[in-house]
């Protein structure tokens, strides 16, 4: 399952870290992310408040789930 996590704070970092441990998770993406998150997920420069941008990114990446 490919997942996009939206946000770049400590909560999102913890979510990404735990998701990265799961064998059920394929590709892991985050927007906007941060330096720590980028160790576990590919990060993109789309603001969490840019709803249209996040939707477009999710469609482009063809993710199975978005965690906000």
Model-identified regions with their sequence ranges:
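ATP-binding N-terminal substructure of ATP-dependent carboxylate-amine bond-forming enzymes
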Residues: 1-68
